[in-house]
Regions:
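Membrane-integral, polyisoprenol-dependent glycosyltransferases
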Residues: 2-4, 10-12, 20-422, 595-596, ...
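Membrane-embedded architecture of ER/inner-membrane glycosylation machinery
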Residues: 24, 33, 217, 221, ...
Length: 626
């Protein structure tokens, strides 16, 4: 029995219709139907506010952020924008685009943590705009808005968009490459109508039309920037998505089920060649080389081949062939990591993949929708599958797959909601149940960590209430029809992610003790200390030292002690284990002047310096010494 309900709230992504058992007419695939007002404004404002909330003042957290930030600062200070250097040592782990972006922000806004993180935030916004464009053109304006905000509102994107790392920049470039290439065959859905033919863009028996030369050059230039960002994967990755997708479209358009196996094989070969011709490989490669090659050649000449050898052989081939830096995992690592990284939208991702696969293989699905879903599924599979085969694994390696996941979830969710299929469905109940579980897990994780070295962060556990309350709002909206449950889901994801990577993360980052220890060393030295480390050094120490840090290995204890005795402004950072090795031979007048316990470590980091400094200076340091 149909139930009446009030008109839904006037949300920019709501569908204006009852959401109980009544089935309002679904908007057409080309976006005709309920008007969606100002989608660009909605996405830009919502994304900008969410990203801004995440910019709480906090020190660099992991090992990568301070390392990359220090390289960019060195470029700005030395004027050498070609050779990346870290602590006066050649840095071969990443190309130069990220460092250039950070250094440019340093020049505009000063050298600090927030300017180093601005490029990632702008890149995340650029990816959201690409998803808005793709979702709108390939499905509907509502799908475009939901896809863009689902991207902004998932946990790993929130983290990477506020990190001084290259992954958000790489994802923006690869997403725009994929979208611009696919548009030529997907095009505005109105041109494809709602026909269910095999492909309205590629006529039967014909090769796909080639990319316009200008667009091919633009895609190649973006690929060149991606190669400058993270190496060959930035160019190869999008092509590994587009080429098989175009070939599949051409093969389906010309397929004759009654033909012999030999003829079908020849048709498949023609489709593959047509896909290669479609991308205009000569223009594409020349444009990529025009952007990327000058720097690669310059850095190779300046370093006598050391930088290219280290980057390509160690950080590309080496990382793929063997685990590096203890970053290993099984074949399902990235699939499981996405359940956390794509949260809260990951709670609906498995169901959305099943529905999208079913829709993409049905002949009665409108051709534009079928092609768009097929592209999204292939896009997701290529990036996740390729890095699942690599030996070295980190969750951020598959960040370029997250835009595809956002499109798949958005297309599925908007279709089901617009059809009025959310009156107590099992899929919604299951998904919201996992959303609630994620909120409980967030709170529990922070509370447990607070008992194991993460002090003063108990209040950050409140962020776990957001998914719980948001899931309740989604469920109530679906049952009562008073507002759009999809709008509630978008809202909870943005609020949760914004708070989790902003105020909550700032509380957690306060437990990062190494920056405070380095500042204490500077104060002990009367302004600027000359720092050395014995046995262990970290990028955090190098960045906050604001100068060169001598790194002494365990077998170099004599040199470390001689260095410590070289002046009153020289301090030595050691672990408790390292101190036990050198303590009997410490120079006269030196000793422990400060210590902190790094997060989740069993021992302290210690400052060894002059103990006969003036009392006022000692008083300043003892306030932070336990």
């Amino acid at each position: 029995m149909a139930a009446t309900s009030p008109t839904p709230m006037n949300s920019p992504i709501s569908h204006r219709g009852p959401m109980n058992n009544q089935r309002p007419a679904r908007p057409s695939i080309d976006g005709r139907g309920p008007a969606l007002r100002h989608p660009l404004v909605v996405v830009v404002v919502a994304a900008a506010v969410t990203l801004a909330v995440g910019f709480a003042p906090m020190p660099f957290w992991d090992e990568d952020e301070p390392r990359f930030a220090a390289i960019a600062r060195t470029m700005l200070e030395t004027g050498d924008w070609v050779v990346p250097m870290h602590n006066d040592t050649l840095a071969v782990d990443k190309p130069v685009l990220m460092h250039w972006c950070m250094a440019a922000c340093y020049r505009l806004f000063g050298v600090s943590e927030i300017p180093a993180r601005i490029p990632s935030a702008l890149a995340a916004l650029a990816t959201a705009l690409a998803l808005l464009r793709a979702g709108t053109v390939w499905f509907s304006p509502r799908t475009g808005v939901v896809a863009a905000l689902a991207w902004i509102g998932c946990l790993l994107v929130g983290i990477e968009s506020h990190a001084a790392t290259p992954d958000a920049i790489l994802t923006a470039l690869t997403t725009w490459m994929t979208v611009l290439a696919a548009e030529s065959l997907l095009g505005p859905t109105s041109t494809g109508s709602n026909s269910t033919g095999s492909n309205s863009t590629v006529p039967r028996g014909a090769s796909p039309p080639r990319l316009p030369a200008g667009r091919a050059a633009l895609i190649g230039a973006l690929g060149g920037l991606a190669v400058l960002c993270k190496g060959p994967v930035g160019f190869v990755g999008p092509l590994a998505v587009i080429l098989p997708w175009v070939a599949a479209l051409a093969w389906q358009a010309g397929r004759d089920p009654s033909a012999s196996v030999g003829r079908q094989m020849r048709a498949a070969i023609r489709a593959g060649l047509g896909a290669v011709a479609f991308i205009r490989p000569l223009i594409l490669i020349l444009a990529m080389l025009a952007v990327a090659a000058p720097w690669y050649v310059a850095v190779g000449l300046r370093t006598n081949g050391a930088w290219p050898a280290g980057f390509f052989l160690i950080h590309n081939v080496g990382r793929f062939a063997a685990p590096m830096e203890n970053h290993s995992g099984g074949i399902f690592f990235h699939l499981l990591a996405m359940l956390v990284g794509f949260y809260p939208w990951s709670c609906f991702l498995p169901f959305s993949i099943v529905v999208a696969t079913w829709r993409a293989t049905r002949t009665d699905t409108p051709a534009p929708e079928r092609r768009g879903l097929g592209l999204g599924l292939l896009w997701l599979s290529v990036w996740v599958g390729a890095f699942s085969l690599a030996a070295t694994k980190l969750p951020n390696y598959v960040l370029p797959a997250y835009p595809a996941a956002a499109l798949i979830v958005a297309a599925t969710a908007t279709r089901l909601v617009d059809r009025g299929s959310v009156a107590m469905p099992r899929w919604l109940a299951a998904g919201l149940g996992w959303v609630v579980f994620g909120g409980i897990a967030t709170t529990a994780t922070i509370l447990i960590a607070s008992r194991h070295g993460l002090e003063g962060v108990t209040s950050a556990a409140l962020v776990g209430l957001v998914p719980i309350l948001g899931a309740a709002a989604c469920w109530w909206g679906a049952r009562s029809g008073r507002f759009d449950p999809l709008a509630a889901m978008v809202g909870l994801s943005l609020v949760y992610t914004g708070l989790a990577v902003g105020p909550a993360a700032a509380r957690i980052a306060s437990a990062n003790a190494l920056p405070r220890l380095v500042e204490q060393a500077h104060r002990h030295a009367g302004g600027t200390a000359r720092l050395s480390t014995y046995g262990q050094n970290t990028p955090n120490v190098v960045y906050y030292a604001r100068g060169h840090v001598n790194e002494w290995r365990p077998e170099q204890s004599d040199r470390a002690l001689a260095d410590l005795a070289s002046g009153g402004d020289r301090v030595l950072l050691v672990t408790e284990e390292g101190l036990r090795k050198i303590e009997p031979n410490l120079p006269s007048g030196t000793g422990i002047v400060g210590r902190v316990r790094p997060l989740f470590k069993d021992g302290d980091f210690l400052i060894i310096g002059r103990t006969d400094s003036p009392p006022a200076r000692q008083a300043a340091t003892e306030s932070l010494t336990r």
